[in-house]
């Protein structure tokens, strides 16, 4: 009897811990807070661009432009890998992401401080290993622009009318992703990596 009670206690403790985690990483927000995420990233991009324009040496401009382009080119692979291998396989991220699948029109998004922290930690800090602050900043700027493009595209496929051919196609493929058991169409902004890895459907 005592053992049974202890097991029940541990089950309750685990459930309570998971609820605390979900509260800390609150994914569903008020409408204003949801849109504030877009504003925050636009401001970050404008600020970093202004700093590069104002302070980067002229001799670094070619490298900066190439690094921004490299960050933009890198983003679709990051998007695909995060969506497929983290959001659909790795707990607790999978559980959080399934909330979006269950309620696709709810105002669910990754907290800005969390996503910005990931970009800083996983992109900017490793990029500094190049030994060039300007290249590292440019690469991070490119990835951040890519993330903002992803956020807008993902928002559009769920909330906007798909009058344009490109958006209509993205919306159609993303709807297949939501309704197929989620094992296809991981790319939101592009299907390039779905084509490469054979996960495109439709």
Predicted regions and their residues:
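Interfacial helix-loop-helix junctions of multi-pass membrane proteins
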Residues: 157-170
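Low-complexity, intrinsically disordered Gly/Pro/Thr-rich segments
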Residues: 174-179
